[in-house]
Amino acid sequence: MAASRTRSWLRRTGGVLMALLCLFLIYELAMFSMVVWYAHRDPGSSAIMREEISRLRETDPKAQLSYTWVPYDRINVTLKRAVIASEDANFTEHDGVEWDAIRKAWAYNQNQQAQGRATIRGGSTITQQLAKNLFLSGSRSYLRKGQELILTYMIEHVMSKERILELYLNIAEWGVGIFGAEAAARHYYGISAANLNASQSARLAAMLPNPRYYDKHRSTRYLNSRTAILLRRMRMVDIP
């Protein structure tokens, strides 16, 4: 009798696990289909945009995002160089994830936390940030991070580096309700993304880690220092 109950429990457990595996595979297939779609189609919005407009409309039901898609060749090369210099210096060389950078960021953040400092460093590549911004929420969990890694490898497998950077620059957050290079250039400088100069591009790139804060605090010591550093570094950056 006990052996029969054990076999019955194992069958039920096996059935549940198989059903969960099938659901997981169906979900990942759907995500892969979306990655393939965006390899050839420009998104009208993104997960991070939908999250932000919901947040803004909690206090202002009529709130709108500032977002205009522009093709890769209408974004000034200086912004491409500055963003890569700021966010992912090895963008053209890696396969989507830089494990050494993640380990170094983790060690740095642990040290900052031990000293009671709020400054943190991210280890995510441009492709990882794109996966998060385009498909996922801003919440933090091990499950979400795992899905981000899966999407990152999907994106790198399907898309060219140029397409990845084009998507990233067009959906990156650059302030409160400000998304994409074109909207950022017009919001901060009153010009198109095609007409940005090196100094303007470096400052926009320096804002990326905390764009909502720097939208309201546009001349902090850190932002000025980071802009100067990027101006020097961006000349040595390779772009796709």
Curated annotation (Swiss-Prot):
Q: Which GO terms describe its biological process?
A: cell wall organization; peptidoglycan biosynthetic process; regulation of cell shape
- Pathway listed: Cell wall biogenesis; peptidoglycan biosynthesis
Report the principal subcellular site.
membrane
Q: Which gene encodes it?
A: mtgA
Provide the protein's localization.
Cell inner membrane
The keyword Glycosyltransferase appears for this protein: yes
Q: Does the keyword Transcription regulation apply?
A: no
Q: What is its EC number?
A: 2.4.99.28
Question: Which segment of the chain is annotated as a signal peptide?
Answer: none
Major enzyme class: transferase
Q: What name is this protein filed under?
A: Biosynthetic peptidoglycan transglycosylase
Gene Ontology molecular function terms on file: pentosyltransferase activity; peptidoglycan glycosyltransferase activity
Q: Name one Pfam family in it.
A: Transgly
The function of this protein is: Peptidoglycan polymerase that catalyzes glycan chain elongation from lipid-linked precursors.
Query: Any idea which UniProt keywords this protein has?
Result: Cell inner membrane, Cell membrane, Cell shape, Cell wall biogenesis/degradation, Glycosyltransferase, Membrane, Peptidoglycan synthesis, Transferase, Transmembrane, Transmembrane helix
Q: How does it sit in the membrane?
A: Single-pass membrane protein
Cellular component (GO) terms are:
peptidoglycan-based cell wall; plasma membrane
